[in-house]
Amino acid sequence: LELHSPIKDKGDKTLLVALSDFHYGLEINEFNNTYNTTIFLERLEHLLCETIDKIKSEKISHIVVLGIGDFISGIIHNAIRIESRENVISQVINVSEALISFIDKLANFGYIDYYDCVGNHSRLFEDKNNCLAKESFDLLIHYILEQRFIHETNVNIHDFTISERIGE
């Protein structure tokens, strides 16, 4: 992706970008569907290019990025764990790096507010009754993003409060 200079004459519009269900690490090679980490990166790059085009054409100055969950394939189902081509730690690291790159590139074009929530695929155990709400790989992804952008003036990684009742 070739980044061009930021827009000089920005408007006061806000753009919402929703990110969800990456299931990073999962590999599918069926007659009607193919998905793997390479395809994930291609799709994220395509979304980034489309988003930047929209920012430029609409003179958008504020971008709200919503992470709606299931960024990783995770380990909650044995069948999914076996189909995953990366261990869960690599999934967390690589998704975090992809999100950092995505947000960092968008930040060249406007102010970023990032919000996220926990997905079910990031739980540590299959049975949700055996998990505490705060036992989630999504919290690691959030922490990595928070630490990466802590000193950035135009990126705000918002904290979230986890209700212990989520998933009931």
Named regions from a protein language model:
Residues 1-168:
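Extended recognition/assembly regions associated with phosphoester-bond processing machinery
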